[in-house]
Amino acid sequence: MSENQNPSPSPEEIEAAMSANAADELNRLQGELAELKAKSADLADQFLRAKAEAENARRRAEDEVAKARKFGIESFAESLLPVCDSLDAALAIENATAEQLREGSDATLRQLMSALERNKVVIVNPEAGTKFDPHQHQAISMVPADQEANTVVSVLQKGYLISDRVLRPALVTVAAPK
């Protein structure tokens, strides 16, 4: 045999090399597993923190809505107190004349309308001839009239809006088709 030829490795050498490769691969995989476990634990922690933060934000939002409702009603009620005071003062007068009662009622109505306006309540009181709007008007009856069909003839009861939302539609009579 010549010395330049590579002798084939012995089975023991092959087994030792495979064992070393397997050990290296096992160490690499164990390191990768440890990294992935750490990353998983970190992500689980981030998830729990985000979930808790979302729950806290939801609770804060609910509390703010409840406070807004409470204080919104409080503000509205506060604006009505002068109306109550005026009515109490009117009832305290024992010998009021009809004219005094009328003047007091007018003043009280102005106070009430002012309070409603401050709270964005708007009157719906369509003029005769206005096109009937089913979103703001409720037709009580149709009557023959000398005006265009489906227009308001008269208002039986005013309606009210709050921020473009109908609280109560205006009750109206409507011109019947000719």
UniProtKB/Swiss-Prot annotation:
Q: Which InterPro entries match?
A: GrpE, GrpE_coiled_coil, GrpE_head
Spell out the GO cellular component terms annotated for this protein, sorted alphabetically and separated by semicolons.
Answer: cytosol
Predominant subcellular localization, coarse grouping? cytoplasm
Q: Which Pfam families match?
A: GrpE (PF01025)
Question: Subcellular localization, per the record?
Answer: Cytoplasm
Keyword Plastid included in the entry's annotation: no
- Identify the stretch(es) annotated as Disordered: 1-22
A single Gene Ontology MF term assigned here is:
adenyl-nucleotide exchange factor activity
Q: Which UniProt keywords apply?
A: Chaperone, Cytoplasm, Stress response
Q: Which GO terms describe its biological process?
A: protein folding
Tell me the function of this protein.
Participates actively in the response to hyperosmotic and heat shock by preventing the aggregation of stress-denatured proteins, in association with DnaK and GrpE. It is the nucleotide exchange factor for DnaK and may function as a thermosensor. Unfolded proteins bind initially to DnaJ; upon interaction with the DnaJ-bound protein, DnaK hydrolyzes its bound ATP, resulting in the formation of a stable complex. GrpE releases ADP from DnaK; ATP binding to DnaK triggers the release of the substrate protein, thus completing the reaction cycle.
Complex and partners: Homodimer.
Q: Which family does it belong to?
A: Belongs to the GrpE family.
Name of protein: Protein GrpE
- What is the source species? Acidovorax ebreus (strain TPSY) (Diaphorobacter sp. (strain TPSY))
